[in-house]
């Protein structure tokens, strides 16, 4: 299990709350919406470790009991009349109708948002059915929308896998960008004797890293800024996103961190080469050598297509060791490949993921699996809804 102190080292904990937003960012409010059991568990996890002051976590579910125990500052019971707070029973149509019934409440909660990140586990009732509706509402209020989703374990059966695929296709029509997290591949990074609880926790951790990685880019001021307009421009290439987070310590740590973020045995054939836009955000000590930083930027330019638009951002902090570098890379505009698999991925700074404080390690790109390798919504527990 990941302890809070470890997560803070990964910049998800209290330290991130104390950061002061870039004044130019003011008004670009971020709302993170967890949908169903899986998404709500991610919100719980996010709240436990702390979020930036400009990020509002919202938990939504048709299961009233599960929602009641969530620490989110904003909670919305979907379909109070139609479901009675008893869940969607694994039926997406019920989840969809529940979200439509609660549309006004959802709209009110996100009306001031400039960026809405919606997270869920596909394959069940609430997540699969309600998420596309919530994303559409976010688009209606004028927000940039990013969907971060998981898919069912292969062993959960064809019906659940089919529901997940249908839900994903619907999300493709409405989201500005989609990040699909392959939980079967996450399990490959776990110790062989890892408990069920550790594995489920791991899925939540990866979801939190994805949310934190995106929000960090525009909530932290730096010498070289990537602002909300840059993120909006990058995500304007509607489709699937590739995301990596890497860390390294020592000589050439900036370049090593980048390599950790874009290279992994789990990446298969996915790379940043096919992207149309790339955002790279470095975090390091103020006295980190400029030459090393420059070489890392050159390395990324060499890896990307010559016509790709690459934007670099930089945040410095005295709290980061002088030879340590953390990098977040978001590549957008990728299409799903011929076997139906997407290029979405999320990198973690260690192996296995449950040890996020390891200073130098292989970044683990977790790519959406092939049609035969579908993965888990954070569910199985009570997350079927």
Curated annotation (Swiss-Prot):
It comes from the Bacteria. Its main location: cytoplasm. GO terms for biological process: division septum assembly; FtsZ-dependent cytokinesis; protein polymerization. InterPro entries: Cell_div_FtsZ (IPR000158), Cell_div_FtsZ_CS (IPR020805), FtsZ/CetZ (IPR045061), FtsZ_C (IPR024757), Tub_FtsZ_C (IPR008280), Tubulin/FtsZ-like_C (IPR037103), Tubulin/FtsZ_2-layer-sand-dom (IPR018316), Tubulin/FtsZ_GTPase_sf (IPR036525). Keywords: Cell cycle, Cell division, Cytoplasm, GTP-binding, Nucleotide-binding, Septation. GO terms for cellular component: cell division site; cytoplasm. CDD domains: FtsZ_type1. It is found in: Cytoplasm. The keyword Cell cycle applies. GTP binds at residues 37-41, 125-127, 156, 160, 204. One of its GO terms (molecular function) is GTPase activity. Pfam families: FtsZ_C (PF12327), Tubulin (PF00091). The keyword Nucleotide-binding applies. Homodimer. Polymerizes to form a dynamic ring structure in a strictly GTP-dependent manner. Interacts directly with several other division proteins. Belongs to the FtsZ family. Essential cell division protein that forms a contractile ring structure (Z ring) at the future cell division site. The regulation of the ring assembly controls the timing and the location of cell division. One of the functions of the FtsZ ring is to recruit other cell division proteins to the septum to produce a new cell wall between the dividing cells. Binds GTP and shows GTPase activity. HAMAP family: FtsZ. This is Cell division protein FtsZ. The gene is ftsZ.
């Amino acid at each position: 299990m990941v302890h809070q102190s470890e997560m803070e080292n990964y910049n998800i904990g209290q330290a991130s709350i104390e950061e002061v937003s870039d004044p130019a960012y003011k008004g670009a409010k971020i709302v993170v919406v967890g949908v169903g059991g899986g998404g709500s568990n991610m919100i719980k996890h996010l709240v436990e470790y702390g979020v930036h002051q400009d990020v509002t976590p919202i938990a939504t579910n048709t299961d009233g009991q599960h929602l009641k125990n969530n620490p989110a500052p904003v909670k919305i019971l979907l379909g109070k009349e139609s479901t009675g707070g008893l869940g969607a029973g694994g039926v997406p149509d019920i989840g969809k109708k529940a979200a439509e019934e609660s549309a006004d409440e959802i709209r009110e909660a996100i009306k001031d948002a400039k960026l809405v990140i919606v997270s869920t586990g596909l394959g069940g009732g609430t997540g699969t059915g309600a998420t596309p509706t919530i994303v559409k509402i976010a688009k209606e209020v004028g927000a940039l929308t990013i969907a971060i989703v998981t898919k069912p374990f292969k062993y959960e059966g064809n019906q659940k896998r089919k529901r997940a695929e249908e839900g994903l296709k619907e999300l493709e029509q409405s989201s500005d960008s989609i990040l699909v997290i392959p939980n079967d591949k996450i399990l490959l990074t776990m110790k062989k004797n890892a408990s069920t609880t550790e594995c489920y926790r791991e899925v939540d951790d990866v979801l939190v890293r994805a949310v934190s990685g995106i929000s960090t880019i525009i909530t932290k001021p730096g010498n070289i800024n990537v602002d909300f307009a840059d993120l909006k421009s990058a995500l304007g290439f509607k489709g699937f996103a590739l995301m990596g987070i890497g860390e390294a310590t020592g000589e050439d740590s900036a370049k090593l961190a980048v390599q950790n973020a874009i290279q992994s045995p789990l990446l298969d054939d996915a790379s940043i080469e096919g992207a149309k836009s790339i955002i790279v955000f470095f975090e390091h000590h103020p006295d980190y050598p400029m030459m090393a930083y420059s070489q890392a930027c050159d390395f990324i330019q060499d890896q990307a297509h010559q016509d790709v638009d690459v934007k670099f951002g930089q945040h410095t902090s005295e709290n980061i060791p002088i030879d340590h570098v953390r990098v977040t890379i978001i590549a957008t505009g990728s299409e799903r490949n011929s076997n139906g698999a997407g290029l979405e991925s999320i990198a973690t700074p260690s192996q296995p993921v449950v040890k996020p404080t390891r200073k130098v390690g292989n970044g683990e790109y977790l790519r959406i699996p092939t049609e035969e390798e579908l993965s888990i919504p954070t569910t199985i527990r009570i997350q079927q809804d």
